Amino acid sequence: MSLSTLSHPAAAAAGSGKSLFPAGPAAQSVHFPKARLPVPAAVSAATAAVHAEDRVSSLTQVSGVLGSQWGDEGKGKLVDVLAPRFDIVARCQGGANAGHTIYNSEGKKFALHLVPSGILHEGTLCVVGNGAVIHVPGFFGEIDGLESNGVRCGGRILVSDRAHLLFDLHQAVDGLREAELENSFIGTTKRGIGPCYSSKVTRNGLRVCDLRHMDTFGDKLDILFKDAASRFQGFQYSKSLLKEEVERYKKFADRLEPFIADTVHVLNESIKQKKKILVEGGQATMLDIDFGTYPFVTSSSPSAGGICTGLGIAPRAIGDLIGVVKAYTSRVGSGPFPTELFGEEGDRLRKAGMEFGTTTGRPRRCGWLDIVALKHSCQINGFSSLNLTKLDVLSGLSEIKVGVSYTQTDGQKLQSFPGDLDTLEQVQVNYEVLPGWQSDISSVRRYDELPQAARLYVERIEELVGVPVHYIGVGPGRDALIYK
């Protein structure tokens, strides 16, 4: 894969007050604002608070927060910020492969994997929908960790009776399959997600409701064990192992029972009662089983369609969808990454952004923002707005590149994000170069107080994808957010 760089008028025109972008169907003119007198800190904070309240209160009854890249965009933080204004926060797909890092009001860090990010807010009901897969030991491990830190979970979490159970055997199979593929690693988290969804699709999986029928639970689990043993030589299976697992799940069944509910009914009744629901997506659109960089994808649908199938609510009930996009791009594991940076440039973003997986701890691959991939995500999901995260990480760069288009080896420009990986691996990325900024922006809370070049960057993204940026992250804390 090669790249080319387009000279951009922004570098020369910054601060001139003139339009920085050519007029045309894909872009509107952007002008830098005239110089302003300093605003007293108290007035600035009050104005920012009012703007934030207006922005959040205007969200629709059922809203969603979805990842628009390859995950790790910072979805959990936005869900945590928005959750107090919603009655319910719901997860619709995925499992413990999703890692959401959030901070409470005291700055304490919580790494969540299956429990929805709304759990830190006492008045919020958290729902794990039918589209998710549940590793019960891991689920209780999360709950125990939260409660040991003073977060009450009892009576605040509902788990769908239709959700599929993820067993340790699925995790074992995940590792065996990855080893079998040798050099063609997909980059699985080895949490058993893919094998569990495989069991679901082949219709021999067990669901949460099966825990209510322990008289037949062992026979159903035996089928899963035998299937794994017949497929993988390295999988150890015995009747004694099956018996141990059944006894273990008898105890889990008793503890899980208070959490189990028909969440499809609960959510639809809540919609009738005008309660507000915030949907928290796991992973991201570029990892979608249908629309991502297949086969280097997850096993569920982290795009807008997964909300309906993963929660059992009608498409017409869904209103605002917020796409979360990092100010640059990262991905964990294998797979195409057209704008990836190598060497010192990639290391600089990785260190500044602390780009190490919440779930795996693996260093993330880093690169420039890919507008082609972002437009693909916006098209599929119909985002009403974007949350641009980690803008502060770009501080200190003399220039910032944005991948705006792909060119094929024959010189033809691609009109869309290709589904063919061979094509994607060979594209040439065409970049625009924008001026960077040197100041630390982590304490900025008003959009008009950002450096001129930072505002240019935000507005150019809006122009290129045709979706407004309403939220801008400038640090990890829940207060490090600008409402635009």
Swiss-Prot record:
Cofactor(s) listed: Mg(2+)
Residues that coordinate or bind GTP: 71-77, 99-101, 364, 390-392, 473-475
Residue sites binding Mg(2+) per the record: 72, 99
Cell compartment(s), UniProt: Plastid, Chloroplast
GO terms under biological process: 'de novo' AMP biosynthetic process; IMP metabolic process
Cofactor info, note text: Binds 1 Mg(2+) ion per subunit.
Job description of the protein: Plays an important role in the de novo pathway and in the salvage pathway of purine nucleotide biosynthesis. Catalyzes the first committed step in the biosynthesis of AMP from IMP.
Protein name (record): Adenylosuccinate synthetase, chloroplastic
Gene: PURA
